[in-house]
Amino acid sequence: MDSQQKVLNAFIGKVVRKDLAFLVKGGLPVPTYVLEYLLGQYCASDDEEIINEGLEKVKDVIKNNYVHRAEAESVKGLIREHGKHRIIDKVTVVLNEKNDEYQATFANLGLSGVPIGTDYVRKNPKLLSGNGVWCIVTIGYISGEDVKVRWEIQTLKPIQISNIDLQEYIEQRKNFTTEEWIDLLMHTVGLNPDTMNRREKFITLARLLPHVENNFNFMELGPKGTGKSHVFQELSPYGVLVSGGDVTSARLFVKMQGNKEILGLVGYWDVVAWDEFEQQKGRAVDAVLIDTMQNYLANKSFNRGKGTHEASASMVFVGNTKHTVPFMLKNTHLFESIPTSFIKGAFLDRIHLYNPGWEIKMLKKDSFSKGYGLITDYIAAVLHALRNDDRTAVLKDYAKFDGSLSERDHLAIRKTFSGMMKLIYPDGKMTDEEAYELVDFAAECRKRVKDQLYVIDETFMAEPARFKYINLKTGIEMNVETLEEVSNPFKSPVSFSKEENADSLQTNEEASEDHSNGENISDSHGTKRPRIPILQEKSMTFRMGQTGVSYEKLFASY
């Protein structure tokens, strides 16, 4: 049985062919999870006939119920003529204190001030977040005289799965190999696993960490077109993506409305992703935002207005790089493209993971999945539920990190390890080799942050961290290196990853002594000949994705 058939058998009614959303989306400005919510109702099968029939039904639903802004007046007329009509639209709710009622605004239909029942708001507090929630709404029209508001909300259902059986999901893990499970997650996020190596899959999975870990501080910078913001925009109704130009302290954290405090996005969403996180000409970042952000990233709380507020939302920063990695390592640093106001140690030290977006290939036609993956609102609900499962303590069974690491270093590594474990091994069953793969990845992604801090803020040089650990299963000391560190000759000012042992030092001394008499030697006839160095037999290991290696560099001297 192939892995795709395993998926269909294990998750009956919870899978969908991932290219179907593209077939129905067209130019609609609708997240994938909205479309797959509909596809999951009609196309959750591998039977071509059922899929084709379901596709037509979904297309009919979109045609008849999705509100295009250009057709808003026609839809209003339809509602008036028929008395009611079901629509798909993005709904935002505010409290009208004067009337003592909640009122809804419809993004595409163009209606505002529509009364909405308190029960809907209590069950779906994200309606109040100011960012809007995609919903299926039956909206009615009230005829007659002396009617203050003609429109009424008869039914409202947010487009997301209502409940899941988390234990059933975890139980199915045993039916898949690790490679099959990772590939299932790749298909689920809409990508073709056949176009990626294992490291690229890990980097892609890391984008899910903010969804599965509370208060996870994530950053990814890389070239354009590599899918950095895709997961945060399309995957989950529990996350929100905001453009860099629209980010304010009031919108993110809390705003004052008279004497009343209105919570911002972090109070309602699992993930708040800051897109286009890069320096923009002529635009300065509010100092209050930076201070509030730093406090939140460190303490999971923020002080605005009268009190202190706590939240569990993960913060994500994604943006484009301006130069190649070798250029940045040699001339600047790997944070060079972010807003200048954020290039300071106090902020960057709070980042748990720096994902190397430059290692992901630009997305092309064959990069997208045409296979079966879990329906996005189902996996989003699973990840949401897994946020309550803390696996950080498991790390201590495998590794003891050097005492030179700061508490923030330890916390970052623990949280990344915990999140990756929940994603790949939700049942907790993994081999030692698999566990140390997670340890190394987690430590590398934190070391990437720390290496750049030495360049940006020299005060970190006073107590440099040695990124190494004792493997508690073997007792062997292991060094941690970033891939760009081994691929490029331009290192951070402080690096303990390649400490030479006594044998290598002795070999170097011997080699130095061999060459101390000059570059040339004379034969018995007095003819000058170039000295041939004494070469040592050795073996070399290269990491997946490592660059800077050539045949000439390896073998020319031999």
Place the predicted regions along the sequence by residue.
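Conserved phosphate/pyrophosphate-binding and hydrolysis machinery centered on Walker-type P-loop NTPases
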Residues: 171, 175, 197-201, 369-372, ...
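Conserved ASCE/P-loop NTPase catalytic core
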Residues: 192-327, 331-334, 349, 470-496
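Intrinsically disordered or highly flexible coil/loop and linker segments, enriched in small
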Residues: 194, 217-220, 360, 388-392, ...
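C-terminal alpha-helical "lid" subdomain
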Residues: 399-515, 520, 524, 544
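Short amphipathic alpha-helical interface segments
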Residues: 526-557
